[in-house]
Amino acid sequence: MTRLQDDFYHAINGEWEKTAVIPDDKPRTGGFSDLADEIEDLMLETTDQWLAGENVPDNAILQNFIKFHRMTADYDRREAVGIEPVKPLIEEYKKLSSFSEFASKIAEYEMSGKPNAFPFGVSPDFMNAQLNVLWAAAPSIILPDTTYYTEDNEKGKELLGIWREMEEELLEKYGFTAEEIKDILDKVIALDAKLAKYVLSSEESSEYVELYHPYDWADFTKLAPELPLDSIFTEILGQVPDKVIVPEERFWTEFAAEYYSEDNWELLKASLLIDATTIWNAYLTDELRVLFGKYGRALSGTPQAWDKKKGAYYLAQGHYNQALGLWYAGEKFSPEAKADVEAK
């Protein structure tokens, strides 16, 4: 028997580890995972009842969840519709002829939830949590971290190969020719390699104090002169911001002017096309849902996708997780129990 002082982990967990099994559609197991699995089983069983019209909660938001869940679970309908809902979106992006044309539509794309390469968001100010301010992030990279892009990182090359293979299969499903697929992916990977030189690594991102870089709006707009930030935000907000916090300062000061430019348009357009072909995959056929998860499963070491039932539940749950969480709390943590905890 392992002694505590020799190997604390195995002394405590050794017997459990011998029989523990990681489910094929999960990346891990353990105490917290077991609890999550129990909650998942409860929610799947409960929502099955709701779909069948049984024990439906008297809550308008949850009733809307049930309606949406019924749609996500209707795989016959999803198969019949196929990729038709996404075709107009793909054609719209194919027809974009220049960066200036794209830039003139960024506000429209942002407000309609379409791909837009516009990495802005609103969050509390580090210096005053009562105040929400504008933050300028950076476009995301393909690999998990900038360290995967070094020449000697074999895992990065392996993952990029898996990503490319997945995208080749997806683009073929959307009717792109082999020549078009190669051209698009070559351009996307080229832009991604450039971008990885300027975005923050995971280690840098964890240094929260170092991420606070406030800019006056007039100074910030000069960092990407071809990006019409004033007109974009005026269309979205009705005014221009006073200031912006820039955690991804290296991207904005050293690369944004090139990234958001006519000279970079062909590479950026390829990236937008990829986004247009993937943004709604989870809502379409089951084949596309599973295929689109291939790269994510490689990252997490999960060998198997969720089955249809879980896929439909989590797709619907993602939009109603707060309402479902409150329902669960009400079922499992009564007001009396809450008061008892608060009193101790």
What are these regions (language model features)?
Residues R3-D7, A11-R77:
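Active-site-surrounding "flap" and adjacent substrate/cofactor-binding loops of secreted or lumenal enzymes
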